[in-house]
Amino acid sequence: MKYFDFYYGDESEQYSFYTVPKMFFDNDKFKDLSPMSKLLYSFLLDRMSLSKKRNWIDDKNRAYIKYSLKAICNDMCVSKNSVIKYMKELQNFGLIRKLSKEGMEDIIYVMDFSKFNQVDYDIQ
């Protein structure tokens, strides 16, 4: 059997990674969240790093992202229907909020998973 090679020295730092919050696995609140929805959330969190750089901050100082359905499908290597299902699941868990405006790209607010206070925010 052939094996992959080892990492040597600084090679161990050469890749970037998606981070999935540990809380998604060790907190009962998230036990019913599907693994693919957890993965999608990690993609959305990663995209948050662009928010400040691209001035994706609303008038209430809340960061948001723009991430097209097509791009998510491509990045996750899954179908459009699958992404729609995972996005809906994240919405149902309160982990994202979507704002759609006619003729504009959807805005996605990635909610802070570590804060359990479920407040009904108006994002209009």
Where are these regions (language model features)?
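Short recognition helix of helix-turn-helix/winged-helix DNA-binding domains
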Residues: 1-70
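Charged low-complexity intrinsically disordered patches
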Residues: 2-4, 114-124
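Winged helix-turn-helix DNA-binding recognition segment
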Residues: 47-111
